Amino acid sequence: MAYSFTEKKRIRKDFGKLPNILDVPYLLATQVDSYRQFLQDEVSEDARDTEVGLEGAFRSVFPIQSHSGNAELQYVSYRIGDPPFEVKECQSRGLTYAAPLRMLVRLALYDKEGGGVKDIKEQEVYMGEMPLMTSTGTFVVNGTERVIVNQLHRSPGVFFDHDKGKSHSSGKLLFSARVIPYRGSWLDFEFDPKDTIYVRIDRRRKLPATILLRALGYTPEEILYAFFDTDRFHLGSGNKVVLDLVPERLRGETASFDIVAGGETIVEAGRRVTARHVKQLQKSGVEQLEVPEDYLTGKIIAHDVIDPATGEILAEANTTLTPEITQSLFDAGIREIETLFVNDLDRGPYMSTTLAADATRSQMEALVEIYRMMRPGEPPTKDAAENLFHTLFFTSDRYDLSPVGRMKFNLRVGRDEVRGPGILYDGKYFAGLGNADKEADDLIEQYGESSDILDVLRELIDIRNGNGQVDDIDHLGNRRVRSVGEMAENVFRVGLVRVERAVKERLSLAESEGLMPQELINAKPVAAAIKEFFGSSQLSQFMDQNNPLSEVTHKRRISALGPGGLTRERAGFEVRDVHPTHYGRVCPIETPEGPNIGLINSLAVYARANRYGFLETAYRKVVDGQVTDQVEYLSAIEESRYVIAQANARVDESGYLADDLISCRHQNEFTMATADRVQYMDVSPRQIVSVAASLVPFLEHDDANRALMGANMQRQAVPTLRADKPLVGTGMERTVARDSGVIVTAERGGVVEQVDSGRIVVRVDDEETTPGEPGVDIYSLTKYTRSNQNTCFSQKPLVHVGDRVARGDALADGPSTDMGELALGQNMLVAFMPWNGYNFEDSILISEKLVKEDRYTSVHIEELTCVARDTKLGSEEITSDIPNVSESALSRLDESGIVYIGAEVKAGDILVGKVTPKGETQLTPEEKLLRAIFGEKASDVKDTSLRVPTGMDGTVIDVQVFTRDGVEKDERARAIEREEIARVRKDLDDEARIFEDDAYARLEKLLVGKVAEGGPKGLGSGAEVTEAYLQDLPRERWFEIRMRDEAVNQQLEAVRHQLETQRDRFERRFQEKKEKITAGDDLSPGVLKTVKVHLAVKRRLQPGDKFAGRHGNKGVISMIVPEEDMPYMDDGTPVEVVLSPLGVPSRMNVGQVLETHLGWAARGLGHQIGQMLEQQADAEALRGYLSEIYDASGRKEELETLSEEELQELCHNLKGGVPAATPVFDGANEGEIKRWLKLAGLPESGQTTLYDGRTGDAFDRPITVGYMYMLKLNHLVDDKVHARATGPYSLVTQQPLGGKAQFGGQRFGEMEVWALEAYGAAYTLQEMLTVKSDDVSGRTKMYKNIVDGDHRMEAGMPESFNVLVKEIRSLGINIELERDD
């Protein structure tokens, strides 16, 4: 593999032993592909997939017919326009990034008499705005970035289950079947303790299941024949009964008479018939057996028995034979009857008992019964009952299994075909509908006599009979993923259905009044549904933007909650647990702690959803024991059929599995298998974990609970001022940084033309440009913008002018990335030792050096907004002329009343001056006089300026002013506008300049050395054009030269034309952008002006901040110790962090210790390289040392491909330490770490003697020291510390509010009162309960006394006493307080 431009500057040593078969796929593919499939905007209109996305939704609702059938609205196609604003503009203006959706419809009017088409009108209808996905898989809604989380829900289909013996006291298992459609009514079948089968529709009251079958048109006979085998008896004269013998059916029965065959008695009366007896009977070839008459008693007749003479029914189907009935059959001369074959073992009489419990006698009665159950209290009519039943399961408008549901359904009931109708199909029912229904005829032709409902019942009875298995609903073959596209499509369809109802009403008017399609369709419901989904659905979440990793994990999250999913309260233990099918699909580690544990999961690294929405994961194919590089994706359903080896199974040189027995997975169990049985093999050891977990080095040495915390805490790391790559990584860092979208990658290869802190200009290589376009890519970098979590998002260039970059190379770093690698924290020199009790309970001790060097300083950006509204009393005004405010308070404002950029402000400072008109009150004569003298301003406004909130100080880094259309812009707004326009102009000018330079360079190549006919500045006929001549001539006059070769003249003309059109294009683009900038802003109603001020706040590390490693080893900083007091090593290097050694053994996260050792070795090797560079070692010596470091074990590097300069740069970058990658489950082992420590000249034990910085004495035993990668988490003490003197009070109780957000007080609760009582501190207690809490009069007196310098207090009546009195009175008990005074 060739190194990319940034990779070769700092090569990470990879300790992985296993080959890299499959690169990590694009991490945001699930989101991006799903939405692309939904919009299909890059696909031409006729090539779109008609089953999915917007196209699918439109086609499922259209065409819409009027009630009379004379008018029809047909859908033709849709198109998505261009978004009016770019993503960044939407974010700053608080808009939704969306594009207009327009639908082309055709209105057809039919002629009643003639039967032809009378009139057709086509028109495009605006259907509202469709939110677009940004390139990184997010949506911008009202200016904030949001993510739509994938949902894991129960797949549609049929499921068989039992109640685990909970319903009945005997513990009997009651089986049930449930048909779950994608949309429509649920259908449940269940057994009761008496083994009758009941049906429920939509979980309503249960009815015997045969009612449903009768409603479908089945007669009792048909029902019985569908579910039972029958025995045939011949009745002869003299009450002789002969049975057509099927020997297997006798097995297990006790013979009530001697069974005789071929003259010998095979089974004696009273003996049980065994398998041996059955074999003997089969051998003897007996086909009929004479049985005694009473053998019939208790058998159930399978059909109606009719007297041949009179036509009278002697016995109905499902009648149990008694001696009397049997006799009547003999008397009537019936020759043959069939009875149901049932036994206690594996042929239960369930359907028969159900039929006996069913009181209905006909199809109509059954329909009425179902109608009564669904619509209790409504009088049933024939039509209503038939209609209701038909719409429940048999119309595609109301019921849809979806392709997934149909596939799952068919496979579960044992059919081979995965396709089928979206409704429940029953041949008998559709045949009964008659020829009126065209759709029914098509279905009957296609699917014949099959019946979905009968198949489900058969399977259910089979399971009850002990022949089948119930389903595991937590199996990932029974749960599927719904992504953005699918959810948006469902919402869109719901909106369209609402539109359809309105259109149906108006279509009848269209005939009479000649309306156009636009007047028929009101798109508001669609727009409202979409807006509601993206803005406030439970699964549309505010993006977690702490750092690049948290963005990626948020987009790969899979939630079982949300609409149509589970709820926290209802979810049991099984749903949350790790399931064997999670392997390679869902991460077993990364999930939140707390109430959501196991309900919110993360996609595994190689997992993806297939076309049905089931998660599948990658495997290598194994053929006859030889491992191939062919990769196949298997879903959980397919996987259980195969034998799958693990990624670390030993493979010899020729690719054959090396061991005799190999650890494998088969049918969700771990087993050992021989090499020839293995069919697949994992592609990578990190296949089973998610992105966040795969970033934890030595994960295999950590306990699962701590690994979970480690994976979760990496997402909370705050980007530091200077990112520092981890010395010990896992090799995933570059992938995550690239796919997160925070780094700028080259879209096309080329040469860097220009770089500054704000943008990078690349001149694209000729082979990557299309003809006629300027071969220039301009990358604007984002500087100091606020993320969703108020952290700072800023990019800085990595390239220099003249660098050659290829497509996909990193051009600029973003937050928490270092040279294109994810860098969430800093490498710290740590020692595991106690230090004066400051390590108690996982506290962490740090050196002052970290604060001094700003290692963990982070910048947080706060956005403060000031809104000037139009009020009843007049409009608010943003101004620097504020009443009763000192000059010094206004010193940071400009003439418009807005703070300068760069001003350092602290709590309480004015950022935007604003005055609001006050209500008119009755003026005194003096005030009238003052107003007459000083004008209006004196008293009629109050100061409502935007001030810096408490506990915040920082620097103003940006100000934005938004002005309503039609309101005059102030000076500040105009200045901001001018800057913006200048910036756009500069970008376009640069692009144009590079394009022109390029064109003239091509012209020069074309003209120099060719013969001219004539030209300006005395170029004669036949003269040769020289370079010097062209340099003297102004460029625009080059086109006046006439050449002898006509082809060259044509090329000259073509270039001139190209330049002109390009200039026009640039000018047009500039005008467009300028218009956007100068236009007024679309503000919410009543708002005249909005000013947004961004403050940058620097947060240094301080005691109380949360600090953590990557192994779940978290703690709070307890103290910052001067550098000179920290323990130091032999060479005088003080350690930077002291961790508690007790944090390791009980937590079992040994990974942190291994990381510390390897980090120390990595740093030591960097030190050695640094020394070699100082001694100016030659290239060969450096190459030799590097190959010793890189190539002794693990993956080999191609250092020989580097040039000398590249080698020097690499060594220079390695001085701070040689970065190592120890992939998850395939990392460095103890021997390799020791080798590195030895190579770096460090003790192989990883321990060294430390000396106390205060006394200089050596500690009494060697201490583990090394480099650990540590993160500062976004739980900063600055956001939590809070104090109050006076502040707001609660309205009813008059007690201070609680919490920092309300500027509340500290609660002095029940227990604290007990403490004071125990001390007997009566006066302190009184003060706490009265003046410091809810004694209103006492509070005001106290304030007055303090002002007067008198420090006494008088306690009055606490307000809570009055509240208590009122509460007692509300119970109807009068209570009065009698005062002595």
Curated annotation (Swiss-Prot):
EC numbers, comma separated: 2.7.7.6
Top-level taxon in the UniProt lineage: Bacteria
* One MF term in the entry's GO annotations: DNA binding
Report the top EC class in one word: transferase
Q: Name one GO cellular component term.
A: DNA-directed RNA polymerase complex
Q: Which GO terms are recorded in the biological process aspect for this UniProt protein?
A: DNA-templated transcription
Q: Which reaction does it catalyse?
A: RNA(n) + a ribonucleoside 5'-triphosphate = RNA(n+1) + diphosphate
Q: Which UniProt keywords apply?
A: DNA-directed RNA polymerase, Nucleotidyltransferase, Transcription, Transferase
* Function per UniProt: DNA-dependent RNA polymerase catalyzes the transcription of DNA into RNA using the four ribonucleoside triphosphates as substrates.
Instruction: Give the family, as the similarity comment puts it.
Output: Belongs to the RNA polymerase beta chain family.
Q: How does it assemble?
A: The RNAP catalytic core consists of 2 alpha, 1 beta, 1 beta' and 1 omega subunit. When a sigma factor is associated with the core the holoenzyme is formed, which can initiate transcription.
Q: What protein am I looking at?
A: DNA-directed RNA polymerase subunit beta
Q: In which organism is this protein found?
A: Halorhodospira halophila (strain DSM 244 / SL1)
Q: What is the lineage of its organism?
A: Bacteria, Pseudomonadati, Pseudomonadota, Gammaproteobacteria, Chromatiales
